Amino acid sequence: NFDAPGFIWRFTKGETDYCLGINDFPDFLLNYQFRESKVDEQVLNLTPIQSRALFEALLVNAMPQNRVYRYNFLFDNCATRPRNMVEMVLDNKVRYKEPGESLPTFREEIDRYAGICPWLIFGIDLALGSGLDRPMTYREQMFGPEILEKAFSEAVVQMSPDSAAVPFVRFRRVLPKHHFI
C-alpha cells in the first residue's frame, strides 16, 4: 500500500512486502495501452522443454504461499526476479556481454531513476548510506528493466560446450500503442 504510513522509508530500507499479481496478457497489455506506456516484447531463444520449465517456475512463484515477498528495489524486484528464474531454467548458461565503459555507483544509478524527487533521493541516501558509493556490477545494474532488456538483447546462450552460442533473444518487437479517448 503506497499510502501506508512510512511507505517510502520502508521501501528505501527494503522492508516492504509486495504481492505478486497475475493478469492475462490481453488485460496486461490493455492496462499499459491505457496508460500510454510502451511495451517491448522479447521472445527468448528457449526450447519447448525450457519454456515449459519456466512456465512451471512462474506458476510456483505465483502460488498463494509464494505471492507475497520482501521486495528490495535493488536486488529482488520485477526485473531481477524473472531474470533469476530464466537463468535457473537455463542452468546459468546465459552469457551477458559486459559493457566496455565503467559502471555507475548505486547512488548514481538510483539518482537517475529518482529524477526530480529530492526527498526520495534523500531517503534512499539516509537508509542505504555509504554502501551506495561502490560501483555496481553489470548484474546488479540489471535491477532496472531497461538495463535488463539491453542485457538480454546482447546476451548469448550456449547449451553445451560443443554447441555454438546463439542469441538469447530470438526476436524483439514493440507492441503497438492504442490511444484511448
Regions found by a protein language model. Name each.
Residues N1-H179:
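Soluble extramembrane regions of membrane proteins in the secretory/endomembrane system
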